[in-house]
């Protein structure tokens, strides 16, 4: 059984016309979860990753165990106001307005080899902002990894056009 087949699709959620990709069915399946983490970790095992960055909130689910498997540190990127120490931030565009993400100012060291992980790429706006934060701190991004790509929304194309390497475990074209 593939990773993709373990992800539930919920039509018209959270609003009409949206096909929501629900990872909870993947997460509750111990084999599916293990396969997902192992596949990501194996891809980067030889890359000498220093830090694995997880994007709030579902990116944390995958990034922390991958960091553990690689012997790397885990770094959360969170929405504004959620991190307790000094932060740096970046605005990014939403469908209707803007939001802000933050990272602790001491989370990434210059020349750290960084793997970025999120559960899904749609527009690419959140990951684009996260990339800016890591690069501003002097981190070297090895790749941006997603469990799910929604290529029809355009985020993966957008990041590739900016020369950001990315990888996804599965994609949904509809």
Swiss-Prot record:
**Transmembrane residue ranges:** none
In terms of InterPro entries, this protein maps to: Ade_phspho_trans (IPR005764), Adenine_PRTase (IPR050120), PRibTrfase_dom (IPR000836), PRTase-like (IPR029057)
Its pathway, per UniProt, is: Purine metabolism; AMP biosynthesis via salvage pathway; AMP from adenine: step 1/1
Q: Mention one GO biological process in which this protein takes part, according to its record.
A: purine ribonucleoside salvage
Q: Which SUPFAM superfamilies match?
A: PRTase-like (SSF53271)
GO CC terms, sorted:
cytoplasm
Query: Where does it mainly reside?
Result: cytoplasm
Q: Which Gene3D superfamilies match?
A: 3.40.50.2020
Q: Which Pfam families match?
A: Pribosyltran
Query: Is Glycosyltransferase one of the keywords UniProt gives this record?
Result: yes
Q: Which residues form a coiled coil?
A: none
The record ties this protein, via PANTHER family, to: ADENINE PHOSPHORIBOSYLTRANSFERASE (PTHR11776), PHOSPHORIBOSYLTRANSFERASE DOMAIN-CONTAINING PROTEIN (PTHR11776:SF7)
Q: How does it assemble?
A: Homodimer.
What is this protein identified as?
Adenine phosphoribosyltransferase
Q: Origin organism of this chain?
A: Nitrosomonas eutropha (strain DSM 101675 / C91 / Nm57)
